[in-house]
């Protein structure tokens, strides 16, 4: 049955790239080859499906453009295979990739210091994949457990079973690179389905060749590490160039590669400690003599984890997360430890849009360099500790470094909560290095804002001393709360106003008294006029109150002195009876009339006599 999906359709999950770069005919052809290979295998033989060399080179190998900057070609895996089968498949593909790369391009020798990581991870893959479900819930605890186990176990897991490796052409150690190791680890992390396990009867020539190869690689890696990791700066710069040269069409691929590479390198630390203990005859003290090995591994592991978180915010992540088919539970468990600290697209998107892919890759290189330096300082502080204590401390620092870039991408405000520096020396040196590096990327304003804000906040917090006052005492003090000294008549202003308003030793203190200075400075004509008006108003109010009290007391006093209050009805009748006149009779009336007539008659007689006298002539006066 041919698949009807488009060859470049959206993948089904964050790490599911099964149908990218393959059309329906290629998918059908690969399934047929797998079916034929499965039918030819016996029950006791290897569980790995054998494909012909032409199909592997045509579809399952990355092209030359993987290092030239044209993108990474993803390989196709069967739908679901068990964890041990994924480890064996990864080792087989690693050999094929190395064969292809060696024919076309010679990798520089500067990468040889990092070859032991990818080689040592091959030996730890069977043990690592067996505990996938446990590591998904407790990734830090599982890593520590693996470090403790690998110092005791050794190569017993490979000798007890049959060959899990296919016969292949091996290459010298100088031809390996961390990019190829990342490709191999990516194949292990792809979602697969489980098949019934098949055990091997006896070891064959493939296993013997693999043991010889791993032994030679471990010896070459030990010689390189004893040189003091002098080529580490050049290696870091070359690694940044490889990631910057990749095409921006596949940011999701970069995130996957960086995440796989970080897991591979963190696992290889335990095997490197195992190889050192084997060569030193089982002496644990030999592990403490080479702290540079652990420093190199953990610095690159921390930087790879930051690259994964930075690149996870690219726009292609949205297309990757859109799924049409459910992902199996085994795939979710194996990838849980990589998704635990990666936020969603909504949390990582900035306010004014996505950042360009070039800016994201530039920030990836900057954060990688910064965290490498910080991790190296942290590791160099404890060179004399035992192997278990050193692995525990560096595992904790790696876990903290996994959380720090997430906080920087989401919100710079919470960056102080995720402080990871172990001492003041590492803090100052990492701040200076980060400021110098960020000055080169001043063209991207958003990139500088995301990377520079937490640093400026940290420096500001160290140099500024805050003076906090309660709300109740933040008001102004009274303006005229003076305190005068009584010794010698000196006028001095107390601590209320301080010495900022007048000279602490007034020049007029010997001439003008303290009362005069207080009168001149504390009062003004307006204050005097207001005081006079208030005094007059107060006196008027007092007079009004006194008059009111006087009227009230006078009224009460007059009411108390008067004994008469009111008359009753009986008293009124008695008064009328006593003062009533006597009744008038006829005789009394006639007598009153006669009296009146007599009076009138007398008046008339007087008038008559007067008229008569007036009528007589006047007599002459003698002597005239």
From Swiss-Prot:
InterPro entries under this entry? C19orf44-like, DUF4614
The alphabetized UniProt keywords are: Phosphoprotein
Annotated stretches, region: Disordered: 108-138, 217-236, 305-329
Which spans does this entry mark as compositional bias, Polar residues?
Answer: 115-138
The organism sits in which domain of life?
Eukaryota
Query: What are the Phosphoserine sites (modified residues) in this protein?
Result: 112, 205
Q: What is this protein called?
A: Uncharacterized protein C19orf44 homolog
The scientific name of the source species is Rattus norvegicus
